[in-house]
Each structure stands twice: as C-alpha cells, then as structure tokens.
C-alpha cells in the first residue's frame, strides 16, 4: 500500500504478500527495502568505478522511510531523506521518524 494525495493505492507488494500467505507460491522479493536490490546496486557501483571503497561513501537518497531509508540502513550505506518532494511534501516527517523509529543519517529539503 502506498500513500497518495488523499488516499492509499494498492501496490504489487500487497498482492505478493497475499500470494505468499496462501502458501501456493514461493515469493522472492526484489526491490526496496530488500537487500538484494541494494547489494546489486553496490556491486554495480564498484564495477563502474573499477574499485571498492567504504560503504559509508555511498548514500541512498529518497523520500521514503520504509523503502529508501530502511533499505539503505540495512545494507550498510548512508541514507538521505528528502522532505520537500514525494511522500513527505507538506507532511510532518519528524513525527513520522519518531513514530517509525527509522532514522536517516541526513535530512535535506531537496536535491
């Protein structure tokens, strides 16, 4: 489920969770906040740069605590929450951070 301007929309993750609960399907999640997508991105960064470096030099920049920030934190990279765009535009991001206990490394209004 994803927040919209005045309601919520049902997203693919909702349907896959229902399939998983039915035990009729074996579900493999690939996408934020699951580690596979972050590990793949980190591998690509190392491949393109032709060297490895500390993960704290890589940052996940996004507008969602539950996908962008949570996934970045779980994968060991820095996280940057953008607040004047996307999910938190015109919303109290500080209240949501306290409610969820998901703390980004950095908070910026825009890129």
Language-model segments: which ranges?
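Asp-based, Mg2+/Mn2+-dependent phosphohydrolase catalytic module
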Residues: 1-111
């Amino acid at each position: 489920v994803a927040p919209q301007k005045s309601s919520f929309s049902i997203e693919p993750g909702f349907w896959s969770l229902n399939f998983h609960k039915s035990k009729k399907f074996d579900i493999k999640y690939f996408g934020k906040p699951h580690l596979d997508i972050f590990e793949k991105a980190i591998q690509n960064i190392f491949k393109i740069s032709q060297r490895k470096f500390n993960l704290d030099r890589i940052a996940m920049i996004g507008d969602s605590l539950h996908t962008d920030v949570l996934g970045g934190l779980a994968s060991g990279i820095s996280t940057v929450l953008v607040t004047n765009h996307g999910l938190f535009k015109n919303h109290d991001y500080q209240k949501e951070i306290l409610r969820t206990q998901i703390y980004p490394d950095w908070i910026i209004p825009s890129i």
